[in-house]
């Protein structure tokens, strides 16, 4: 799944698909509401594309808007960052929630539905709302290195609806599989969507559609696509290694009895598992910096707790969202994302803490609170 997601995202990246969505959304919303357009674009793009790649592709558009409107670049960059952070943390097929869902053995369809709800609220609060405050409080000019960049040649970009359609393929198939499992009237087509909605199959179909619709149809040869997809697998080694470590941690906790010790301690505190999952993820995130490591380690601990297998699919999906939220908060000096944002935006460490770190915390806390509310109905 991680490998297919990486290849899918790489094709979307090199074809200009991310830029297509950004340019189209900004045109639809207009300059005054462009911050909302960038937030939505970031959310959509970060599902198949890695956070850092999405940021590097889209940040020139945020800078061009800041230059055009003479506003602080943070007015547009923060919403973009919030959207990317939300898509990266909450909504499959991005690797983090997929890995957590796998470790907790929860249906990806439920994870997508809960993730979308959590993500929308988190993007609004941490994106346009916080971005507007940052834009007024901190004037950050457009970096000189990008101030004179050429405008995007829209004639070379693929169709907006083609991009959206391809991105929606895995999401729709996985959700339909989940719906067919709980709606008796759809029992006749359930076997079909059970196959097509299998995450690996759904993502494989999306990747094949991207290869044809965004690759071969736009002049790329199979050899060029092979190079793009092979290169996209380079970052996945660390993700798979971290996943394996998280799985080992889960079984160490489970078979050593530590899972029961933690479970008994939690029971005495009367903490719901959703809240516990968030707290564990926050502690790991602050300690190690990496959101993916925090997600995997927190999921390993939560998966080893007694009674976790008896929870409903919806509650487990809320737990996945809680882990995602906790793994997003408090980005600071030990997080590579902190330094990437500082470098690209051209701000010092103090300003990065006051803008980016607070934005990440708003994303995580808002997403968690929405998941907590949903869990009351699970």
Identify the residue ranges that each predicted region occupies.
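Long, contiguous bundles of hydrophobic transmembrane helices that form the permeation core
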Residues: 113-227
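Juxtamembrane and boundary regions of transmembrane helices in multi-pass small-molecule transporters
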Residues: 69-71, 106-155, 325-378
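Membrane-interfacial loop-to-helix junctions in multi-pass transporters
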Residues: 25-40, 68-76, 199-201, 233-239, ...
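Membrane-interface helix termini and inter-helical loops of multi-pass transporters
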Residues: 21, 97-108, 180-194, 222-223, ...
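Hydrophobic alpha-helical transmembrane segments of multi-pass integral membrane proteins
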Residues: 2-12, 28-61, 85, 240-246, ...
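Re-entrant/interfacial helical elements at transmembrane boundaries that shape
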Residues: 6-7, 19-24, 53-65, 94-104, ...
């Amino acid at each position: 799944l991680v490998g297919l997601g990486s290849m899918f995202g790489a094709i979307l990246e090199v074809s200009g698909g991310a830029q297509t969505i950004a340019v189209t959304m900004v045109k639809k919303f207009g300059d005054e509401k462009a911050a909302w357009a960038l937030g939505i674009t970031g959310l959509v793009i970060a599902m198949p594309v890695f956070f850092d790649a999405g940021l590097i592709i889209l940040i020139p558009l945020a800078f061009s808007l800041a230059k055009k409107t003479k506003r602080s670049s943070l007015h547009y960059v923060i919403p973009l960052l919030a959207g990317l952070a939300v898509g990266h943390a909450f909504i499959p097929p991005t690797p983090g929630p997929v890995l957590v869902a796998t470790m907790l053995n929860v249906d990806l369809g439920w994870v997508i539905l809960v993730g979308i709800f959590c993500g929308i609220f988190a993007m609004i609060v941490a994106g346009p709302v916080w971005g507007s405050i940052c834009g007024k409080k901190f004037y950050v000019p457009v970096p000189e290195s990008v101030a004179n960049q050429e405008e995007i040649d829209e004639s070379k970009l693929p169709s907006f609806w083609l991009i959206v359609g391809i991105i929606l393929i895995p999401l729709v198939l996985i959700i339909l599989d989940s719906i067919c499992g709980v709606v008796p009237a759809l029992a006749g087509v359930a076997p079909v969507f059970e196959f097509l909605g299998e995450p690996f199959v759904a993502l494989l179909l999306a990747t094949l559609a991207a290869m044809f619709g965004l690759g071969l149809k736009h002049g790329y040869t199979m050899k060029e696509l092979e190079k793009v997809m092979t290169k996209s697998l380079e970052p996945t080694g660390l993700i798979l290694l971290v996943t394996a470590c998280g799985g080992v941690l889960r079984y160490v906790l489970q078979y050593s009895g530590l899972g029961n010790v933690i479970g008994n301690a939690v029971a005495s505190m009367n903490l719901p598992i959703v809240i516990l999952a968030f707290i564990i993820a926050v502690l790991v995130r602050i300690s190690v910096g990496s959101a993916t490591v925090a997600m995997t380690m927190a999921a390993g601990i939560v998966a080893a707790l007694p009674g976790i297998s008896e929870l409903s699919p919806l509650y487990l999906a809320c737990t996945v969202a809680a882990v995602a939220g906790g793994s997003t908060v408090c980005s600071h000096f030990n997080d590579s994302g902190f330094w990437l944002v500082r470098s690209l935006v051209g701000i010092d460490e103090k300003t990065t803490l006051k803008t980016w770190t607070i934005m990440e915390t708003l994303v995580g806390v808002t997403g968690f609170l929405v998941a907590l509310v949903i869990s009351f109905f699970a």
